[in-house]
Amino acid sequence: DTLAWLEQAVPRIRRQYSIKEDGKAILGGYSLAGLFALWAATQTDALYGVAAASPSVWFPGWSEYEAAHPIQAQRVYLSLGDREEHTKNQTMAAVGDNIRALHSALIQRGKACTLEWNAGGHFKDADLRTARAFAWVMEGKR
């Protein structure tokens, strides 16, 4: 439902604010919102970039899903706290391996992608990390 709403809202916003059709749409978020942004990029080619700060790529089945339905965005920012994968919960501990694998796959597919490691756990500096994610996607550098 959220993706369908976005697909209707973006053209409406472009018209309302006279944004050129070739304006670059970026979707992003932190944690589960970061995972949603990555998932949305598997569903549409309307996104130029994804800013996924500490995305919940530990989610069961995500890696297999993305491999079968590749992310279509041109630019993808990924980040993770360097303590996030060090947890007793085996499902969530997969986040480190999963984000490394996603980063490698995106690079192999020719996407502009970076993986930034941040000091601390999942909840450290979420606001700053999210801002850095959007800034990287908007800068347009490899």
Locations of regions flagged by a protein language model:
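Alpha/beta-hydrolase active-site loop
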Residues: 1-16
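The feature captures the conserved acid-bearing segment of alpha/beta-hydrolase catalytic domains
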Residues: 56-125
